Amino acid sequence: MANGGSDSDGPDEEVEALARALATLLNPSKIDGVVNCCVRAVHDEAWEGPRMGLLHVRFGEDRPRVEDLAYLLWSECMYYALPRRRQERFRREIASDMTAVARCYRAVRDLFIDFNARHPERASELGEVLAYCLVQEHLGAAQVASKMSLKTAANMPVHGLDGIHAVFENGALTVYFLESKLASEGRRGVASYAASAAEFLSDRRQYLREYEIVADLGNLDALEGEARQRALDHFDVIGHPELRRRERFVGIICHSEPGHFGKRLRIRDDQPPDIHERDFAERYAADYGKLRLTARKQLLKHGADPAKAIVLLVAVPDVRELRKAFYAAMGVAEREFPLDGDDLEIDDDEGAGGDPA
């Protein structure tokens, strides 16, 4: 559904202004302090997609820092859940009155509590916040619509994308459609993501609705002047089909990896403390070929284009324990839900045979 065409022969001043304006919507993040990337999602001339990155929770010597990751993700909710203008208002209030910190915390927490009360059958917040952080950090794309605040509005549908991010690069606006998954294993998360990608990409009505959300209710209202109008034009796919834009569907899959995490080196004082993290990263990275082949097979199986997909896999010892720690950091009662992909049939040899690339 990406549009071609050209609105200029090269990057003019207006285009550069748009790129700078979108960059101002990026929020600071410390996700790399608790999540390590052992394989980056880079372009590969010998591979037709999807791009895939492998990440994992960092270690504190020999122990995965699961609680630290949970706390960091809850802290990032201050940026993830609040619309840009409300963030700016809280910044001004906090600058003059430190008690506003408590009001900001309560406002974010209330959004999650309200969402849980309205939709007790859904529990996707952890994955959505993780997706927000990683797409900002590793794709350099700013959030252009706060989906959590929209989901708590009475007249807004709860179903839809988990996030929409954008960056102006290589002469075009790149729009990232985000889908997050919490899975018992990487393969199941990939299969669930592929099914969601195909469902969204085949639904023209929902596709247009997501663009309308950005234009009407998103963070672009925090921009000013010509840059704001140019951004709105780029998200108007009906009124301005001639503008350069590309679209990518990003799956962020946080999954349990008990096998690799269960193999630990002996504690040795004659070695640096990070040998445990480096050992895990090496073993996990060895799965890269079969995991991206699985992702390609699943995307093709569901009729999605692997060349327009990006998959980021995030390994933790037990995703249920991470979710439990996230709710504890938030200060709300834990809720138990099935994990994504548990209801799917996965062949035992899915992804076997190595990476043909």
Regions found by a protein language model. Give the residues of each.
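A short acidic/basic microdomain associated with nuclease active sites
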Residues: L139-N155
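Extended, charged low-complexity segments
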Residues: R268-A357
